[in-house]
UniProtKB/Swiss-Prot annotation:
Subunit record text: The complex is composed of two ATP-binding proteins (GltL), two transmembrane proteins (GltJ and GltK) and a solute-binding protein (GltI).
Family per similarity comment: Belongs to the binding-protein-dependent transport system permease family. HisMQ subfamily.
Keywords from the UniProt entry: Amino-acid transport, Cell inner membrane, Cell membrane, Membrane, Transmembrane, Transmembrane helix, Transport
Name of the protein described by the UniProt record: Glutamate/aspartate import permease protein GltJ
CDD domains registered for this protein in UniProt: TM_PBP2
Species the sequence originates in: Escherichia coli (strain K12)
Residue ranges of the TM segments: 33-53, 74-94, 104-124, 179-196, 212-232
Chain ranges on the Cytoplasmic side, renumbered to this chain: 54-73, 125-178, 233-246
One GO BP annotation of this record: amino acid transport
Assigned GO CC terms: ATP-binding cassette (ABC) transporter complex, substrate-binding subunit-containing; membrane; plasma membrane
Gene3D superfamilies reported in the protein's UniProt record: MetI-like
Gene that encodes the chain: gltJ
GO MF, one annotated term: transmembrane transporter activity
Subcellular location: Cell inner membrane
NCBIfam families referenced in this protein's UniProt entry, alphabetically: HEQRo_perm_3TM
Length: 246
């Protein structure tokens, strides 16, 4: 099959917005980056919290962490997106729900719903990475910290977590890259990210190959940058003689 490529389409004036089609893609690129960064911050903080809970010697707290993981990990992500956008606002107190649905700009609604959904979904995966890393550490580290007079929270803060985070840099890199790719699902609830902009470009120009090739390359570049940065981080923080450190 012969494909008639026309990359000049990106420099043509878009039908609205006082910009070019390339401007549409660039706008979507910025939204994707902003969503990914905000969602990752939520995922890292919440995932670390529940990952710690899953390792503490308290059945209730450990069970709470397990419940969180099972809830978010076993429901399809696209279902969670629509739940956050359509269902959660209805469960909020009436004034807050009405403010979210009627007064907040729709684009902000889409962004907040997507950010919370993607962040909390990824947090369940981060939780398991943190749990596995803490449990992989020699038991003597925790015992030695407690023997030195540190409280359990202090042992986690000063001994266990610094070592655990060094161990999980590679799997955390994979989770960051997965988050960027999963962000494309946000377009299904109305967020105008790269995937949505490519769809618009296709609708108005009928250039499917160029539209989706462009955003494919954009996603590849984003994740290649993440891989490069995290590889440098891994080399910087790894411990000699520990988990492949040299």
């Amino acid at each position: 099959m012969s494909i008639d490529w026309n990359w000049g389409i990106f420099l043509q004036q878009a039908p609205f917005g006082n910009t070019t089609y390339l401007g549409w893609i660039w706008s979507g690129f910025q939204v994707t980056i902003a969503l990914s960064i905000c969602a990752w911050i939520i995922a890292f903080l919440v995932g670390s919290f529940f990952g710690i809970l899953r390792t503490v010697p308290n059945r209730f707290l450990s069970g709470l962490g397990t419940l969180y993981v099972e809830l978010f990990r076993n429901v399809p992500l696209i279902v969670q997106f629509f739940t956050w956008y359509l269902v959660i606002p209805e469960l909020l107190p009436e004034k807050i729900g009405m403010w979210f649905k009627a007064e907040l700009d729709p684009n902000i609604q889409f962004f907040l719903s997507s950010m919370l959904c993607l962040g909390l979904f990824t947090a369940a995966r981060v939780c398991e990475q943190v749990r596995a890393a803490i449990q992989s550490l020699p038991r003597g580290q925790k015992n030695a910290a407690l023997a030195m007079g540190l409280t359990l929270p202090q042992a986690y803060r000063y001994v266990l977590l610094p070592n655990a985070y060094r161990v999980i840099v590679p799997p955390m890199t994979s989770e960051m890259m997965n988050l960027v790719k999963n962000s494309a699902i946000a377009s299904t609830i109305g967020l105008v990210d790269m995937a949505a902009q490519a769809g618009k470009l296709l609708d108005y120009s009928a250039h499917a190959w160029e539209s989706f090739t462009a955003i494919t390359l954009a996603y590849v570049l984003i994740n290649a940058f993440i891989m490069l940065v995290m590889t440098l981080v891994e080399r910087k923080v790894r411990l000699p003689g520990n988990m492949g450190g040299k």
